[in-house]
A protein has these predicted regions:
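Non-catalytic signal-transmission and effector/linker regions of two-component phosphorelay proteins
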Residues: 1-11, 109-124
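Short amphipathic alpha-helix used as the core "switch/output" element in two-component signaling
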Residues: 47, 69-80
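His-Asp phosphorelay/catalytic-motif detector in bacterial-type signaling
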Residues: 53-55, 79-83
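Active-site residues of response regulator receiver
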Residues: 60
């Protein structure tokens, strides 16, 4: 009897200080077949990003403990092959844009975010 080979599910880490955004991202990506881990603390998110191998990390730019630039820098330093997507409602400086693989405005997240993450995960 033949076995069906399925591609393993991709695992995402979403880091945002807004519980509502995290809930939205979880629902959106789980409906698209991803395994989603969410974290509201930037520092704990960084710990998770270094402890586990995620297929992509999504993060907010403005967070209280650590801003998105510093968080992206640390993830890039510790996990250089992990795609990082900045999701933000504010303008992202060019220096930060150069640290990440993609920037998606929060107001366009529902249209653009899943396709951006899928494209980056397929690169791996």
């Amino acid at each position: 009897m033949g076995e069906i080979c399925q591609e393993p599910q991709k695992m995402l880490l979403c880091i945002d200080d807004s519980p509502a955004i995290l809930k939205y991202e979880r629902r959106m990506f789980e409906q698209s077949g991803y395994i989603v881990v969410t974290e509201a603390s930037a520092r704990r998110g960084l710990q998770l990003a270094t402890m586990y191998s995620f297929d992509a990390v999504l993060l907010d730019y403005r967070m209280p403990e650590m801003n998105g630039h510093d968080l992206a820098y640390e993830i890039r330093r510790l996990r250089p092959d992990t795609p990082v997507v900045m999701v933000s409602g504010s303008e992202i400086p060019e220096e930060t844009r150069q640290l990440v693989d993609a920037v998606v405005p929060k107001e366009e997240a529902n249209r653009e975010l899943v396709s951006t993450v899928a494209r980056l995960c397929d690169r791996l």
